[in-house]
């Protein structure tokens, strides 16, 4: 019995409780806690610093432009017949132009982007896949003005066509496609390979597996990427200023005549230092922010509640 007692006493380190308490109060532990607090404070400070300019911009635009948005005239009328000195008029023509250009951009970009992502994930191997991936990376990093000048050189200088709404959409396509490709590519990679293998085991062809299994599984993530890409291109200004001359009238034809948009409306009225033009500038800016925010919110909600 005494032997067992001596063994148990020897198994328990002397002063183990004191050493545990000592670890909490020794300089090394205190230094770690201090570093942790410092890192936490630094992260919160960085968040606040990033939030301050955003809140300031939103507050400035909202406080100056909300009055215009409270009138039905703003949503139902254009600026036709309204001079820079006149109060009134609306942004209906610019909203229609923005939505039309963005819609055509999406119609062209979504199939190209999704098919490219499918190729890279499901079929792409070797040099060809690496070349396509490299070109997508290049397009991701190009400034919007480069895309606008590229379309200008081909559409206007080479083919002699006019500056119309469709030319704007082509420039926006160059900016939207890489966003869709990368977001869709990541969503397709998240689809478990077990689903593909089970489909192949049942004798389903690869193309039908992609159409019936892979794409429906990743649909919510793909749609989120499309909406976020669309929100990005709707806020671009360089293609609109270079390729889309402004008009105060409503134009539904993307292939003929000038077409207004919210960015070009802002640019048109900002050059005037009259109260009426300044109010319209703030109103158009707030309208554009609301449209982009709604698209971003829709994308976030789909990403949160959808299934991948």
Give the predicted meaning of each segment.
Residues 22-45, 59-105, 125, 265-279:
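Periplasmic/extracellular loop-to-transmembrane helix junction in inner-membrane transport proteins
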Residues 44, 94, 98, 134-137, ...:
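Residue-level signal for discrete positions within transmembrane alpha-helices
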Residues 1-49, 299-308:
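Transmembrane alpha-helical segments of polytopic membrane transport and secretion proteins
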Residues 137-175:
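Generic hydrophobic transmembrane alpha-helix motif, especially the helices
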Residues 106-110, 114-126, 130, 162-214, ...:
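Membrane-cytosol interface at the C-terminal ends of specific transmembrane alpha-helices
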Residues 52, 98, 102, 106-118, ...:
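Hydrophobic positions within alpha-helical transmembrane segments of bacterial inner-membrane proteins
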Residues 82-83, 240-289:
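Interhelical loop and adjacent transmembrane-helix boundary motif
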Residues 185-189, 200, 224-227, 267-308:
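C-terminal transmembrane helix and the adjacent membrane-cytosol boundary/short C-terminal tail
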């Amino acid at each position: 019995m005494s032997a067992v007692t001596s063994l148990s006493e020897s198994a328990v380190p002397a002063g183990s409780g004191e050493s545990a308490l000592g670890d909490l109060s020794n300089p090394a532990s205190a230094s770690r806690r201090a570093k942790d607090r410092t890192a936490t404070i630094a992260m919160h400070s960085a968040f606040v610093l990033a939030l301050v300019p955003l809140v300031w911009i939103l507050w400035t635009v909202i406080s100056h432009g909300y009055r215009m948005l409270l009138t039905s005239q703003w949503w139902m009328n254009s600026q036709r017949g309204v001079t820079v000195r006149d109060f009134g008029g609306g942004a209906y023509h610019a909203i229609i132009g923005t939505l039309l250009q963005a819609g055509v951009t999406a119609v062209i970009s979504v199939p190209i982007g999704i098919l490219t992502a499918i190729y890279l994930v499901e079929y792409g191997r070797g040099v060809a896949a690496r070349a396509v991936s490299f070109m997508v990376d290049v397009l991701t990093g190009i400034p919007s003005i480069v895309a606008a000048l590229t379309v200008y050189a081909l559409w206007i200088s080479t083919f002699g066509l006019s500056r119309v709404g469709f030319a704007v959409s082509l420039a926006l396509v160059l900016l939207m496609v890489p966003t869709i490709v990368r977001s869709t590519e990541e969503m397709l990679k998240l689809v478990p390979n077990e689903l593909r293998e089970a489909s192949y085991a049942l004798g389903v062809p690869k193309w039908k597996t992609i159409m019936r299994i892979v794409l429906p599984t990743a649909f919510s993530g793909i749609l989120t990427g499309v909406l976020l890409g669309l929100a990005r291109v709707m806020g671009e200004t360089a293609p609109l200023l270079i390729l889309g001359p402004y008009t105060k009238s409503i134009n539904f034809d993307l292939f003929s005549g000038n077409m207004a948009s919210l960015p070009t409306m802002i640019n048109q009225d900002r050059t005037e230092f009259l109260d009426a033009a300044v109010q319209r500038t703030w109103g158009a800016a707030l309208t554009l922010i609301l449209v982009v925010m709604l698209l971003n919110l829709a994308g976030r909600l789909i990403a949160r509640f959808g299934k991948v």
